[in-house]
Amino acid sequence: PRRMEIVSQHDFNASPEPWLLTLSLHENRHVVQTDKLNRGIFRAATYLLGDQGIAPAVGLVPLWFLEGDAVYTETNLSSGGRGRQSSFYQPFRTHLLQHGRSIYPYDKWLMGSYKNARPNHYQFGYMMVGYGYLKYESDIWKSSLEYVTKRPYTLFPFYFSLKKETGLSRKELFQSALHYLDSVWNE
């Protein structure tokens, strides 16, 4: 059994979906993610450290994936969700209209910039996760999480798994996803 306590305030975005439904779908996906990461050495760590024993595993997974996967889930399991709002794609669309295909390096897209508007980790992650599900098998992200729990001793296990599953580096996967979005919007 799992338990989740949600202390919420009203949603600040206009959405047709009830806010608590969207929030519970999103947060429940994080519960599923941590359950998938609670394997191997990290499971042993939870016996010693309680719920905090899984923290190193979560630290090996990029934040964009954790949040993007949760937004992807909330969008797919409801009639609303942020992935269905045009404003959610605005940073990507604006950039592609102004500059064409990415002139900024991957790290600037990922980490943001004080000078240029960039998507946050929810938007960045939703684009990456959604493209991964569209282009590759639905097991791509499951395999990446399993790789983290089986080989946490590698420097970046999540990215090694991504390369193994897709044949692309994280930067190449991002460029491919951005080019796909550009081609869809140009149709």
Q: Language-model features: where?
A:
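Juxtacatalytic substrate-recognition/specificity segment
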Residues: P1-P56, P62
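Solvent-exposed, acidic/flexible segments
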Residues: N13-L25, G59-E67, R118-Y126, Y133-L134, ...
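Solvent-exposed, polar/charged alpha-helical surfaces in well-ordered, non-transmembrane soluble domains
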Residues: T22, V71, Y126-G130, L134, ...
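Catalytic Zn2+-binding segment of zinc metalloproteases
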Residues: E27-A44, D69-F88
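Flexible glycine/proline-enriched surface loops and loop-helix/loop-strand junctions
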Residues: G50-P56, W109-Y114, G125-M127
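Active-site rim elements
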Residues: P56-L60, G112-P119, L145
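Short helix/loop segments within enzyme catalytic domains
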Residues: Y72-I103, D139-E146
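Beta/coil-rich, acidic/histidine-enriched accessory regions frequently appended to metallopeptidases
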Residues: N116, S144-E187
